[in-house]
Structures are given as structure tokens and as C-alpha cells.
From Swiss-Prot:
The chain crosses the membrane at residues 38-58. Component of the Sec protein translocase complex. Heterotrimer consisting of SecY (alpha), SecG (beta) and SecE (gamma) subunits. The heterotrimers can form oligomers, although 1 heterotrimer is thought to be able to translocate proteins. Interacts with the ribosome. May interact with SecDF, and other proteins may be involved. It is a single-pass membrane protein. The keyword Electron transport does not apply. It is found in: Cell membrane. Keywords: Cell membrane, Membrane, Protein transport, Translocation, Transmembrane, Transmembrane helix, Transport. The lineage of its organism: Archaea, Thermoproteota, Thermoprotei, Sulfolobales, Sulfolobaceae. NCBIfam families: PRK09400.1-1, secE_euk_arch. This is Protein translocase subunit SecE. Its main location: membrane. GO terms for biological process: intracellular protein transmembrane transport; protein secretion; protein targeting. It comes from Acidianus ambivalens. Belongs to the SecE/SEC61-gamma family.
Length: 58
């Protein structure tokens, strides 16, 4: 499949994805939000701790 055929097929693929996808309910959305925020906070804390350790080493 060449590039032009793939580009022509994109709207059809997007339409299929949108028809299959469904909007999450409030509980599912809040769970995803909490998990995302916890992971972001963890990664930020980890990055800060690494930066702090490296600042004292160097």
C-alpha cells in the first residue's frame, strides 16, 4: 500500500474508530484522571529527586 492510498483511507479509518469508541462514564473518567495525576506526580517527584541527588554529587 503506497502513501497516497493510505492517506485516502484515513477518513474511513477515523470514522470507524469514532463509531466504535464510546464516551467514558463519570466514574471511569475520574479513575483515569486520578491515575494519570498520581503517575505524573510520581514521575515529577522522581525527576526532582534525581536532580537533587545529582546536584549534591556534582
Amino acid at each position: 500500500m503506497n502513501l497516497l492510498e493510505r492517506i485516502k483511507k484515513l477518513p474511513e479509518d477515523w470514522k470507524r474508530i469514532i463509531t466504535v469508541a464510546k464516551k467514558p462514564d463519570k466514574d471511569t473518567f475520574s479513575m483515569y484522571l486520578k491515575v494519570t495525576l498520581i503517575v505524573m506526580a510520581f514521575v515529577g517527584l522522581l525527576a526532582y529527586l534525581i536532580q537533587l541527588v545529582l546536584a549534591f554529587i556534582i
